[in-house]
């Protein structure tokens, strides 16, 4: 007989589970209060009895720490229960092991495990548990999962999916598929939020393989626009935190994201899944930190903006050269040249009677070649002085030691990173490929190679990071990946889409990243879930991706509207905004080619409640947003308006990239506007 066979039985069971959860939450509240009261009593006792003996203090200290630990555990339990009381579970499979006399077990799957200590049964299984993987990977029939004891084989006889909101079951679907299309369509048709949401209820089989991949030391995810790659990467982090709890925690992970707006947009996913937020940084922050924040530099955003507004052949040539594997090979040869030619040993008169010969000092420089060059001075000094002590039986003073170290350091001509970097271009006979901007400002493309040289000379591995997640992988150059590999010799998840590069002269494909990191398993996501079929089809005309498979969710055809002049175009955009405001949509993105165009549009529209997001913004907001295509990467909106799509504004390859990014932000409705006689040739 099937457990909870009818929908009526399922609704009744759901209410039982919610009542039990609320009962346990109530008990934990009492327990938390008891621990707080006990700690307050200890505090009062210690305050009132200042003369108690050390043994009693020690005993009380242990009791206080014990109450703290138990109290924190109870609070953590309450937090997890509170997360599932509104939506206890979203799926169910009935599974029977193949071995004899095993009953059919109903397995309800939710965001967290709920083990009822009273009945000693697991009522809800965490979506990350090994047994839960069958919900995503199998249809009805034979199935298996990997348990700590090995592979467990069996049969799935029933599969259900539920939509539960605020403790009420909206509907239930019998499903023979991995994730039923009706459920997926309903989720995809929903409106965009101000934060990215978890997708545990609709994870697809190919996405699940990426999330649960434990073997790959470096996993490179190439996913088409709207394939959910960022969300999948975050669910992968949540899975790894669950699977390896005890050996890795949230603070051991680092996310490299493109900007603070995007970092804020994705900040809700891990807490929704019951994990702590993960540290986040940007590529340029990390590179600048390696260089001890010594140099002013053009940001990546400023580089892209210059390429969009006033590109010059020389600037493009410098970027392309520094993004090539030939450049990396040349840098490596130059580092060997430094090793062999930059240390010029000299005799050092240590005392009136003792001189350290140049040959001996030179020998020690190469003896300690396991260290980065600048790290050798300390070891060389200690070794030389130890040898002097053996030979001359004397002990040097601190002043003599410091003098020797200073002299050894002076013999090395590579103590200034920037000078060494300039030397490289002279050595290559290409001095024109290095250019400092006004106020001694470095170009963005010089930041990574300068950091690469610094690490070769100084060292700088960051072993505190156990897993590195790099998003928008296509916008980073091979030399940047080389720096990341040297800085973070840990496991990595790298994700992006080669079709969405805003850095066409310095971008990387999955194969290039694999080559730069010397390792990496590439997994691909072809299905696009974000946009309607019509919007995806329109985007394909701008940049064809033969691998992309659109989900069959239909909607309005994108509109391209022509106007006689800018005034008419602006008036039409205001009407489109009014139509949006009267609709059920929650978010509208007005996406311009550049930040200056976006700022100008915001000024001209003069509509209340419009949010202009710049490269300096730090939070994503719901509602009407005016933003550049570069800043919009990774975000999504119910509706998108793209102004000024004339042939003068969108004509170069980088313009095509920006237009593709802008178009693929739209979920349900897309309108492009322009004034003049011709629209961009890309549409």
Feature annotation, model-predicted:
Residues 1-200, 204, 208-212, 680:
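Extended, charged low-complexity regulatory segments
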Residues 92, 209, 218, 252-254, ...:
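Beta-sheet entry/capping signal
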């Amino acid at each position: 007989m099937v457990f909870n066979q009818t929908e009526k039985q399922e609704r009744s069971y759901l209410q039982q589970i919610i009542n039990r959860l609320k009962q346990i939450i109530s008990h934990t509240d009492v327990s938390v209060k008891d621990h707080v009261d006990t700690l307050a009593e200890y505090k009062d006792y210690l305050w009132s009895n200042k003369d108690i003996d050390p043994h009693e203090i020690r005993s009380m200290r242990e009791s206080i720490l014990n109450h703290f630990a138990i109290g924190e555990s109870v609070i953590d339990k309450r937090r997890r229960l509170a997360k599932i009381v509104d939506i206890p579970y979203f799926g169910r499979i009935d599974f029977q092991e193949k071995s004899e006399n095993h009953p059919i077990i109903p397995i309800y799957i939710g965001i967290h495990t709920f083990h009822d200590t009273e009945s000693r049964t697991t009522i809800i299984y965490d979506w990350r548990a090994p047994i839960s993987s069958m919900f995503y990977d199998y249809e009805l029939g034979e199935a298996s999962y990997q348990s700590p004891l090995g592979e467990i084989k069996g049969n799935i006889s029933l599969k259900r999916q539920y939509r539960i909101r605020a403790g009420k079951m909206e509907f239930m679907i019998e499903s023979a598929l991995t994730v039923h299309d009706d459920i997926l369509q309903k989720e995809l048709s929903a409106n965009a939020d101000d934060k990215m949401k978890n997708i545990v209820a609709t994870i697809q089989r190919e996405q699940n393989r990426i999330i649960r991949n434990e073997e790959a030391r470096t996993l490179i995810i190439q996913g088409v626009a709207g394939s959910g790659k960022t969300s999948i990467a975050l669910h992968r982090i949540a899975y790894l935190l669950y699977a390896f709890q005890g050996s890795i925690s949230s603070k051991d992970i680092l996310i490299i994201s493109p900007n603070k707006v995007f970092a804020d947009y994705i900040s809700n996913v891990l807490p929704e899944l019951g994990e702590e937020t993960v540290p986040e940084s940007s590529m340029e922050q990390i590179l600048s930190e390696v260089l001890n924040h010594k140099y002013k530099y053009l940001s990546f955003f400023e580089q892209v903006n210059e390429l969009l507004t006033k590109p010059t052949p020389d600037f493009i040539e410098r970027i392309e050269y520094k993004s090539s594997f030939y450049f990396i090979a040349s840098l490596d040869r130059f580092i060997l040249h430094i090793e062999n030619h930059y240390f010029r040993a000299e005799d050092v008169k240590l005392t009136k009677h003792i001189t350290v010969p140049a040959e001996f000092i030179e020998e020690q420089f190469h003896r300690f070649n396991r260290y980065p060059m600048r790290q050798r001075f300390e070891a060389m000094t200690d070794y030389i002085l130890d040898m002097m002590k053996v030979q001359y039986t004397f002990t040097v003073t601190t002043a003599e030691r410091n003098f020797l170290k200073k002299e050894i350091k002076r013999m090395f001509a590579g103590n200034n990173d920037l000078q060494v970097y300039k030397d490289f271009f002279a050595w290559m006979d290409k001095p024109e490929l290095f250019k400092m901007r006004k106020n001694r400002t470095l170009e963005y493309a010089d930041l990574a190679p300068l950091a690469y040289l610094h690490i070769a000379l100084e060292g700088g591995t960051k072993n505190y990071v156990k897993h590195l997640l790099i998003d928008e992988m296509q916008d980073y150059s091979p030399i940047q990946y080389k720096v990341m590999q040297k800085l973070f010799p840990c496991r990595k998840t790298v994700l992006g889409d080669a079709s969405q590069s805003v850095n066409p002269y310095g971008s990387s494909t999955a194969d290039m990243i694999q080559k730069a990191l010397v390792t990496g398993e590439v997994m691909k996501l072809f299905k696009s879930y974000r946009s309607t079929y019509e919007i995806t089809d329109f985007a394909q005309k701008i940049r064809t991706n033969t691998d992309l498979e659109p989900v069959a969710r239909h909607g309005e055809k994108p509109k391209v509207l022509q106007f006689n002049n800018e005034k008419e175009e602006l008036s039409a955009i205001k009407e489109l905004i009014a139509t949006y405001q009267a609709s059920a949509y929650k978010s509208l993105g007005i996406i311009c080619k550049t930040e200056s165009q976006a700022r100008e549009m915001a000024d001209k529209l003069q509509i209340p409640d419009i949010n202009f997001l710049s490269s300096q913004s730090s939070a994503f907001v719901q509602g009407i947003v005016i933003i550049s295509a570069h800043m919009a990467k990774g975000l999504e909106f119910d509706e998108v308006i793209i102004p000024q799509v004339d042939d003068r504004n969108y004509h170069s390859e980088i313009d095509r990239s920006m237009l593709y990014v802008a178009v693929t932000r739209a979920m349900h409705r897309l309108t492009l506007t322009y004034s003049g006689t011709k629209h961009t040739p890309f549409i």
